[in-house]
Amino acid sequence: MRSWTRPVLPGSVLLALIACSGGGAPAPKYPTGPEASLATAWEDASRTAHTLVLGGTAIPYTATAGHLTAIAPDGRTPEAAFFYVAYTADGQDPARRPVTFFYNGGPGSSSVWLHLGSFGPRRLVTGEPATTEPTPFPLVDNPECLLDASDLVYVDAVGTGLSVAVAPYANRDFWGVDADAAVFRDFVRAYLAANRREASPLYLFGESYGTPRTAVLANLLCAAGLPPAGVVLQSSVLDYNANGDMGNGVSCAGFVPTYAAVGAFYGLDTPPPGDLTAFLGQVRAFTAASYTPAVQAWLTAGTPPDPFLVGRLNAVTGIAPALWTQDLNLQPGPVRTGLLPGTLIGRYDARVSAPAGSALASEGDPSSTFITPSFKTAITRYLQHDLGYPDAAGYRISSEAANESWDFSHDGKQLPDTIPDLAAAIEQNPGLKVLSLNGYHDLATPFYQTELDLARLGAQPNLGVRFYAGGHMVYLDDTSRPLEKADLAAFYQAAPGWAGAWTPPALPVRWTLAPPAVPAPEPMVQAAPGGPLYDPYVPPGKRRPSAAPPSSGAALREQVRRKLDAVAGPNIPRPGPGPAPDRR
């Protein structure tokens, strides 16, 4: 069953929309360029009825695909027409039923990867890490769908998918850490109001750059009186300044356990590990005790590595001693090209590889090139044919312009460190549940670096940390996805002991080079226009990690205090007078 509906907005906003309604005017196009905007907001949506069987139980649900206007905190000013797809189980009590907002990162990525790859009602079968699945991938009912735990809302950032600014704003006005999080806050608030879900338990689910967005957004929502019940951090990069791929002077200690996991997958570690989890625990300990102080000496004083250390690194990672001797602070680029000579291994999922010079290697990441065309084709067809949304042909899965134009600055740093934002959200809402999910074979957001970042929070009773075999998009792995679903189910239910017994690693004394770090070079191959987007990716000219060590303890508490003093959070400066939103 299909129908067209108009979400109900409260009070003065609803009256403004009705007053400006233009009757039978045609739907606008949704341009995604930097200067693009709509003259007025547009909020028509398609509604379709479906049923999904999960665990033997039939769940009838309604899918809504369309646009909803983010309204500024003044309650009058339209900012952006967000495209979203919501899945709502029928017949549930909205006061008890959770609602979860999903988004990817980039920055400049739509939500297509989470939408059609993870825990929605329908899922593309990729077969990764194998690359033998015929393309385009089949779209199937998803037995790991989260509709048995929560209603689901997939949201595209402004300038991606079909989301676009409303004049006088342009898309570019929302392409920055703070402006992006603020307009997401305003969308969440608009969605909850339009659907009368203000009392529903609120959850956020961000992936990659979506994790720093989640940290900032959670803090802003708490300040706005809409505290989330929980946040999910999939493949985190919470502090860009501590990620060794962002600058030549930033320690790559966070990558070493991932290198070990990748070496084990290819049978290069000596001796071959029996239990991967136990082995990686040993590698973490070795990294903290031996590698980290050595690489700091290498970075600050040029102290050459001890041959015994190089031998141990070769044994636990399979990476040739020559690479470690050449640069002890070994970034993932040389590992991806040098681990298996003549072969390029994936950045998103290092278990995926392709011969150098092959079509699969031509865009710089075979694990991304393999899946991107199918996702790009599937989302348009799915929106049009399954969800009855007629204007999906212009759906943009990623925006290189957004990534190139992005303002990465945040809290006085050129690159964002959002651990203080997450800490501020926890301070405002001590019951906030946080679930961190990482893949062992992800060379974009390494799992041990996530641990080091989260360790700055200290022991947190409501923080769960989980690792799986898999890459950046763990959920594409058919073995790991059911495990991830089980962990998410326990998270939503707040089952006793759901957080587990994760012990934060000890923080190193210093993680970065004293002078400003030299920007890391370009990736081996720059993504082609319309091709796979590196996520997280920072253009080389903007890779200026802070020389200051990450805050923890008293210094972190002081940062949190300053954030809480700014209770309202950042708003988006309005460029000039503009019309009220128009509903047609």
Predicted feature residues:
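Alpha/beta-hydrolase active-site loop
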Residues: 147, 157, 174-192
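N-terminal cap/lid subdomain of alpha/beta-hydrolase-fold enzymes
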Residues: 30-34, 69, 76-173
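Catalytic histidine-centered segment of alpha/beta-hydrolase-like enzymes
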Residues: 471-481
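Long, low-complexity repeat tracts used as extracellular stalks/passenger repeats
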Residues: 507-584
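Alpha/beta-hydrolase fold nucleophile elbow
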Residues: 197-208
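Alpha/beta-hydrolase fold catalytic core
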Residues: 297-444, 456
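Catalytic histidine neighborhood in serine/cysteine hydrolases
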Residues: 458-473
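A catalytic-pocket lid/entrance helix-loop region that shapes and gates access to the active site
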Residues: 121-125, 219-312
